[in-house]
């Protein structure tokens, strides 16, 4: 069982690091509060666009396709990291590691083919499922109630 002095002696550097980092954060926040501008007025919270009066809303509406691209990038980027780690240790992993990496790549390719098949990577405008034909109902052929 460790005594308190042994624990303190073992973890003193981490405690000093925590105290210094918390103190530095508090010092920066206090400095910003003291030195920061104190403008209070009608136009304080309005967005500033290089001296031009802002028109409309400041929010941009982005297509969901951009979020899909970002999500695909993150997914395939993380998998590239796994493959890089495997490629640096290929000699130590042997044939078992090669087979595991091949299965991993096949799963990635299956996922990519699935995304292409469902049209997740298609940037063209959506096509209609059916053609809309104009109706040929005339007023003369209509039944009277």
From Swiss-Prot:
Its EC number is 7.1.1.-. It is an enzyme of class 7 (translocase). Belongs to the complex I subunit 3 family. GO terms for cellular component: NADH dehydrogenase complex; plasma membrane. It is a multi-pass membrane protein. The chain crosses the membrane at residues 14-34, 66-86, 96-116. It holds the Pfam family Oxidored_q4. It comes from the Bacteria. NDH-1 shuttles electrons from NADH, via FMN and iron-sulfur (Fe-S) centers, to quinones in the respiratory chain. The immediate electron acceptor for the enzyme in this species is believed to be ubiquinone. Couples the redox reaction to proton translocation (for every two electrons transferred, four hydrogen ions are translocated across the cytoplasmic membrane), and thus conserves the redox energy in a proton gradient. Its main location: membrane. This is NADH-quinone oxidoreductase subunit A. GO terms for molecular function: NADH dehydrogenase (ubiquinone) activity; NADH:ubiquinone reductase (non-electrogenic) activity; quinone binding. It catalyses: a quinone + NADH + 5 H(+)(in) = a quinol + NAD(+) + 4 H(+)(out). It is found in: Cell inner membrane. Signal peptide: none annotated. InterPro entries: NAD(P)H_OxRDtase_bac/plastid, NADH_UbQ/plastoQ_OxRdtase_su3, NDAH_ubi_oxred_su3_sf. Keywords: Cell inner membrane, Cell membrane, Membrane, NAD, Quinone, Translocase, Transmembrane, Transmembrane helix, Transport, Ubiquinone. It comes from Erwinia tasmaniensis (strain DSM 17950 / CFBP 7177 / CIP 109463 / NCPPB 4357 / Et1/99). NDH-1 is composed of 13 different subunits. Subunits NuoA, H, J, K, L, M, N constitute the membrane sector of the complex.
């Amino acid at each position: 069982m460790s005594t308190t002095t042994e624990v303190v002696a073992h973890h003193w550097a981490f405690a000093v690091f925590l105290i210094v980092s918390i103190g530095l954060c508090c010092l920066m926040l206090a400095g910003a509060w003291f030195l920061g501008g104190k403008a209070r007025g009608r136009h304080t919270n309005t967005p500033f666009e290089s001296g031009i009066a802002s028109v409309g809303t400041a929010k941009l509406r982005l297509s969901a396709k951009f979020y899909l691209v970002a999500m695909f990038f993150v997914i395939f980027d993380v998998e590239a990291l796994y493959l890089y780690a495997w490629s640096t240790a290929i000699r130590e992993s042997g044939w078992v590691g090669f087979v595991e990496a091949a299965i991993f790549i096949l799963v990635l390719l299956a996922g990519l083919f699935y995304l292409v098949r469902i049209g997740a990577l298609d940037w063209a405008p959506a096509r209609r499922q059916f053609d809309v034909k104009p109706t040929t109902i005339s007023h003369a052929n209509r039944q009277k109630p």
